Structure formats: structure tokens, C-alpha cells
Regions:
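N-terminal charge/polar-biased segments
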Residues: 1-16, 118, 246-264
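Soluble N-terminal domains of membrane-associated systems
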Residues: 1-102
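Cytosolic regulatory modules rich in charged/polar residues
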Residues: 35, 107-121, 173-174, 199-204
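Alpha-helical transmembrane segments and their cytosolic membrane-interface
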Residues: 79-147, 236-245
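C-terminal ends of transmembrane helices
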Residues: 114-115, 158-171, 216-229
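Core alpha-helical transmembrane segments of integral membrane proteins
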Residues: 119-199
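Generic detector of multi-pass transmembrane helix bundles and their immediately adjacent loops
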Residues: 190-264
Length: 264
């Protein structure tokens, strides 16, 4: 701890500030709650004796200052994913910094870089998860085994398509609308071949797109008193839900126009 107290102003303070901002960005863009991002950054600042540190976090940005407003920094966080392994690694790093186990900024920067490089699960694991989730949801919503198999096929296609979109920078509403359309189309075709109702398969597979995390974290932000972040997350959830409805409705409408059959 003595080494921390001897940190000079200037370049070393800037390094500490940049490190704390990078840690906060890593937490926010990988699915951490807003109040936990603020709390973790404040703990790191206090542990490294960065005086007069103040931080304000939104769902897509971080604002922080240190000293008598001599240092300030803003970071935009436009994209958010969910990688709880990275969140856990950064949280563990903050605890080790607070306890003195990690007591230099050099070691802290190295550990943070390692945490940010933790890979996502392999493609086949994500595809298998999508397949299993769609199959189980189809059965939960009243579908038979055939509907579950149709949902599993759609889940595989949807998961593979989402991975493709992630690698090629396709995001926003278009990704959700096109994925929902793909799911609906595959479920209709699969259920036609298997001679079973498509509604349960469609609903079950669409569940893998539902914005459960955004909705839940929005409610949590409201409970914590952060109404702005809560509103942003709730709007995100509503937009995703609307995109799912649009994508599904387009395919169902086209199917009804071409065949004259309205799926219940």
C-alpha cells in the first residue's frame, strides 16, 4: 500500500484514470449492472488513491473526473453483449486490488487485458444452446415432439445466423427482424413436412430472441433509482420485442397471402 501512496501526479495519475475507465467499459459492455460498474470503479479509484474521483454511468456511456476537475474522461459504449466470465474476472480483479494482492498499476493493466481477452463460448456450444433452448420452449408452450424438432432446427439456423451477423457487424433492428423472419419461415416449412402445428414451434424458437436481460436490468435500474438508465434499457427491450413482432408478422402475412391459410 505504501507504493500506491507514493504515486505522483501527472502521467501515473493518467494511467490510473485510463485503467479505471477501461475496467468500467469492460464491465458495461459485457452486461454488468450500471450501479455495479460505478461501485467497482469507485473501489479501484480509492484503492489506488485517486483523489476526488467521481463517476456517472449510463447504459451506453461513462463520465468520470478526478482531482479538482483536472482530469475528466468520457467513454462511449455503443455495443453491449453478455459475457459474465469477463464481468466476473474484472470484479475479481477489483477485489484483489482492494485487498492489496494486486498493488501496482502495471500488474492491474496486465490482468485487465487478460480479462478482456476471455473468449466467448465456441460456436458449436452457442448453436447447441440455441437448439436446446428452442426445443424445450416449444414443449413448454404446449407443442408436441414434432413441434420441438421443428423448433430445434429453427434454433440451429437462428443461432448460426446470429453468429454470422456478429462477425460481419450486422446489428440493430435489422438483425432482430431478419432473425425472427428466418425462424418463422423455417418453423412453417419444418412443421409442414412433419405435419404438425407451427405456432408452438414459432413461439418456442422466438423465445431465444426475447430481451429478458434488458427488461430485467431495466427494472433493476428503476429499483436502484437510476430512472434514466432504466428507461433506456426498457426502450431497448420494447424495440427488440417490436422487431421480433415485425419479422414474424411479415412472414406470416406473406404465407397467408400465398396460401390463404391463417396460422392460429
Amino acid at each position: 500500500m505504501a507504493e500506491r501512496e507514493l504515486y505522483p501526479d501527472g502521467e501515473q495519475r493518467r494511467r490510473i484514470m485510463d485503467f479505471i475507465m477501461a475496467a468500467g467499459q469492460s464491465l458495461l459492455e459485457n452486461g454488468a449492472e450500471v450501479f455495479r460498474v460505478e461501485q467497482t470503479m469507485e473501489i479501484m479509484a480509492a484503492s489506488f488513491h485517486l483523489r476526488e474521483f467521481h463517476v456517472y454511468v449510463l447504459t451506453n456511456g461513462i463520465f468520470a473526473s478526478a482531482g479538482t476537475a483536472e482530469m475528466s474522461e468520457v467513454r462511449n459504449v455503443p455495443t453491449r453483449t453478455t459475457h459474465l466470465g469477463r464481468v466476473a474476472a474484472v470484479n475479481q480483479l477489483s477485489r484483489q486490488i482492494a485487498s492489496g494482492e494486486v498493488d501496482t498499476i502495471d500488474e492491474a493493466e496486465t490482468r485487465l487485458a487478460q480479462a478482456r481477452c476471455i473468449p466467448f463460448p465456441k460456436d458449436w456450444v452457442q448453436i447447441a444452446a440455441g437448439m436446446g433452448g428452442a426445443f424445450c420452449f416449444a414443449l413448454i408452450f404446449g407443442g408436441d415432439l414434432k413441434a420441438g424438432l421443428a423448433a430445434a432446427a429453427a434454433g440451429v439456423a437462428a443461432s448460426a445466423y446470429l453468429l454470422f451477423c456478429g462477425r460481419h457487424g450486422v446489428g440493430g433492428g435489422f438483425k432482430t427482424i431478419s432473425t425472427a423472419s428466418l425462424i418463422t419461415l423455417i418453423c412453417i416449412l419444418s412443421c409442414h413436412l412433419l405435419r404438425t402445428e407451427a405456432s408452438h414451434a414459432i413461439i418456442g424458437t422466438l423465445m431465444i430472441l426475447t430481451p429478458g436481460i434488458a427488461f430485467t436490468m431495466g427494472i433493476r435500474d428503476f429499483v436502484q433509482g437510476d430512472y434514466l438508465s432504466g428507461t433506456i434499457r426498457m426502450i431497448d427491450a420494447l424495440l427488440i420485442a417490436a422487431s421480433i413482432a415485425i419479422g414474424t408478422g411479415l412472414v406470416l402475412g406473406a404465407y397467408s397471402m400465398l396460401t390463404g391459410v391463417v396460422l392460429a
